[in-house]
Amino acid sequence: MEDCNVHSAASILASVKEQEARFERLTRALEQERRHVALQLERAQQPGMSSGGMVGSGQPLPMAWQQLVLQEQSPGSQASLATMPEAPEVLEETVTVEEDPGTPTSHVSIVTSEDGTTRRTETKVTKTVKTVTTRTVRQVPLGPDGLPLLDGGPPLGSFADGPLDRHYLLRGGGGPAATLSRTYHSSGGGFPDGPESRDIPSYGSLSRGLGVRPPRTGLLGPGPGDGCFTLPGRREAFPMGSESGPPSGRSLPEHFQAEPYGLEDDTRSLAADDEGGPDLEPDYSTATRRRPEYGRGLRARAFEDTADDAGELIEERPPFPAATAPLAQPERGSLGSLDRVVRRSPSVDSTRKEPRWRDPELPEVLAMLRHPVDPVKANAAAYLQHLCFENEGIKRRVRQLRGLPLLVALLDHPRAEVRRRACGALRNLSYGRDTDNKAAIRDCGGVPALVRLLRAARDNEVRELVTGTLWNLSSYEPLKMVIIDHGLQTLTHEVIVPHSGWEREPNEDSKPRDAEWTTVFKNTSGCLRNVSSDGAEARRRLRECEGLVDALLHALQSAVGRKDTDNKSVENCVCIMRNLSYHVHKEVPGADRYQEAEPGIPGSTTSQRRRKDDASCFGGKKAKEEWFHQGKKDAEMDRNFDTLDLPKRTEAAKGFELLYQPEVVRLYLSLLTESRNFNTLEAAAGALQNLSAGNWTWATYIRATVRKERGLPVLVELLQSETDKVVRAVAIALRNLSLDQRNKDLIGSYAMTELVRNVRNAQAPAHPSAHLEEDTVVAVLNTIHEIVSDSLDNARSLLQARGVPALVALVASSQSVREAKAASHVLQTVWSYKELRGALQRDGWTKSRFQSASTAKGPKGTPSSGGFDDSTLPLVDKSLDGEKSNTRDVIPMDTLGPDGYATVDRRERRTLGSDSTGDTSEKELLRPDPGRKAPPPGPSRPSVRLVDAVGDTKPQPVDSWV
């Protein structure tokens, strides 16, 4: 086999050598013919000059030269020329090796070895053809500048090429080395980038020639620099230094670099074949544009980011800044550039240099929304979205020019691209503190149109835009019920239920699906969070919406299971649950069946009994002690705190019933344990506060369940948080939970120190970030008042925690009437216990101090009338919804601020006229306050055990604090 291979290789080598020898002979023959042609041309020059430029045949000299040039370009035609004497010349050869297009010869050999294996060898022989082209170049005299004399020399000039650019040669242009061109193609393609492009070297194969300029073609065909040979007489058609270009009077189009257009950038384009319809150049200027090439149409993507991720709006700026900036977050314009890569509008810098370009005026853009061509409408809407980005002035003018109805009408357009871009513009226009745009969108039917688009859209980007727009609109109070009326069912069944992972009829064999934290889900949950704060009717509609509560709880359970509790979607879901839990003991169907007897006013009966015992001359103290010990003993015996007698259910709870089931306590405690999102912590504590309020059976179960699930340590731990709203929500929740006597004892024993510490921070915070707002201080004082009422042990705990000095100092120094009034009530309650007066007097406190504390300041700073009252009365402030202010079924939340109830995000309840920080849906994503510390991570916070007591073989005591 090896001999066969060697033989084949040798035969191939011999064949190649034979071909080379043949080519060499052919080359010599061609060189000889070249010499003959050169001599003939030299002889033809002399008679032509003497006979007025005519050759022997009578042809004009330029025509004869042109024929000679054409003959020289065609190898094989030179043999017809006469032999002429030789003359001095410079020979130039160009050899080009090409493969024979014929089928290569293949030799196949098969060898079978001794072991039975077969080996197949195939050898291919490819025939190559070598073409040698030779040309003769005369010596050209040089001028004083060292360059060839192009016009003063012989008529041939530079035989190798057309006229050379003297300026180009003086610059030292190396030029390319190229072979003689045999074919020329006239092209109407694009123009070169500029004169500097000819400095780029290119190399022909095996070339040994002079430096010449690269071939150049244009709209008018080949020019003098295109590699053809042009006689001096023909140079008039190609002026010296001229280049191919468009006709005179028309300038070359600029070549713009891809750059961001404003603050937004977009790299996606819309292909004309994707959308159909005419190809449109998005040119909004009045000048005529030329483009070298027609490419694909453009699609600018509407960014999906929603408005709630925004911080405060920056100051107004021109719509087209000269400098670029990173992608903005709050509301993104959809148009990165009106024209990218192939077709684009001029950049800002080029616009300033080129006066014929200008930006379209806003009325022109709005007029394009009525254009009959769909791509014009789409690009106009995208451009409008870009203009509205963080520009309140443009948004206001769009409304004044009646642009909002045009955009709303485009939401029902048959083409998806038009709908998408119109929705993106509406999202930006609906963002901001100015509610006039939101009202205008409502007046022209924007909410129903958005809901229709959400039902019909299957493109995720369109769904993000629709839900983001609805989120912006939901922050406007008059629009909340409109969104509920038109979009509640669609938002629930199209987004919340599918993305939450909840299934109406789950398959027992399959694993439950996890929630999908998509942008669409985040936007929709944010919208429902806003509308759930509208009022009782809105809460009723959301509670009765089939699948909504089930899906939200399933999503929260999924977040806890995956330990992903800090995202915005979880925050929105918890806030919705908190809002729907508000007044649940009054508003849910059948709540009357679970109502319990109204408890007496705190301290009313017992205070009268104590006053009666105190008035007696004998046995007052003994009677007091007997009453206290007997009452405490009875309280412990009346209820077995180790067991909970929950109502029997024949079927699983669903819908709004899930809101107040004891099982939901475990979910909220898990969120309080795992989450580091302050908004989520506040909402979870607020939900427990709502569920533990009221005088009905389920509130009793909730209070006991919190203790059973060891939730009290979790709440007390959060009192150390330096986030004001978290401390406030936890303090109110502890007050409601203390309505359970056993909870009150535990809270008084273990939480009093933290409560007093917050009172001290109200006067002299340890650091600026620890300062508490008035609402939070009042909430803490209300909780202290609740746990010391009817509990001597808790009052002793207050003394041991050095709470009396803090309360007295607060009354004396506070500028808030509400704070001083709340602190006075606590001091009044403490002084009512005779058992503590001795200790107080030993510490230097007198009765006058407590009297002055309770009577020093009344409403608006006026002295209170009446003498000292040692009865423990609750704080009296503004009532809520006509309820008595001294009732204990609900905490008088008006004492916490202008809101009325803390179940709803207070920012959502503010009127936009007084809210200087923007709407809830337009808040910045939660970021840790650099001045506040997060709750201590790790084991410093007690963990919540989510294990049923039934499954524990040796359960710990229910009242265990650790």
UniProtKB/Swiss-Prot annotation:
**Required for interaction with RNA-binding proteins DDX5, HNRNPH2 and SRSF1 and with mRNAs as annotated region, ranges:** 777-962
- List the molecular function annotations (GO) for this entry: cadherin binding
Q: Region annotation Disordered: residue ranges?
A: 95-123, 233-255, 268-291, 322-357, 593-618, 844-962
Q: Where in the cell is it found?
A: Cell junction, Adherens junction; Nucleus; Cytoplasm
Q: Pinpoint motif Nuclear localization signal by residue range.
A: 608-624
Gene3D superfamilies hit by this protein: Leucine-rich Repeat Variant
Provide the positions where the record notes the PTM Phosphothreonine. T103, T105, T643, T872
Q: Which SUPFAM superfamilies match?
A: ARM repeat
Q: Where are the ARM repeats?
A: 350-389, 392-431, 435-469, 470-510, 528-567, 577-623, 647-687, 700-739, 740-782, 783-827
**Could you name the Gene Ontology cellular component terms for this entry?**
adherens junction; cytoplasm; nucleus; plasma membrane
Q: Which regions are flagged for Acidic residues bias?
A: 272-282
Q: Which PROSITE patterns match?
A: ARM_REPEAT
A Pfam match is Arm
Bias (Basic and acidic residues) ranges? 878-887, 920-932
As recorded in UniProt, coiled-coil segments are 11-46
**Keyword annotations from UniProtKB, A to Z:** Cell adhesion, Cell junction, Coiled coil, Cytoplasm, Methylation, mRNA processing, mRNA splicing, Nucleus, Phosphoprotein, Repeat
> Residues where Phosphoserine occurs?
S269, S334, S337, S345, S347, S607, S864, S871
| UniProt-listed GO biological process terms | calcium-dependent cell-cell adhesion via plasma membrane cell adhesion molecules; mRNA processing; RNA splicing
> What does the subunit comment say?
Component of a ribonucleoprotein complex containing mRNAs and RNA-binding proteins including DDX5, HNRNPH2 and SRSF1 as well as ARVCF. Interacts (via the extreme C-terminus) with FRMPD2 (via the PDZ 2 domain). Interacts with CCDC85B.
Protein role: Contributes to the regulation of alternative splicing of pre-mRNAs.
Please state which protein family the record places this protein in. Belongs to the beta-catenin family.
How is this protein named in the record? Splicing regulator ARVCF
Q: What is the lineage of its organism?
A: Eukaryota, Metazoa, Chordata, Craniata, Vertebrata
Give the encoding gene's name: Arvcf
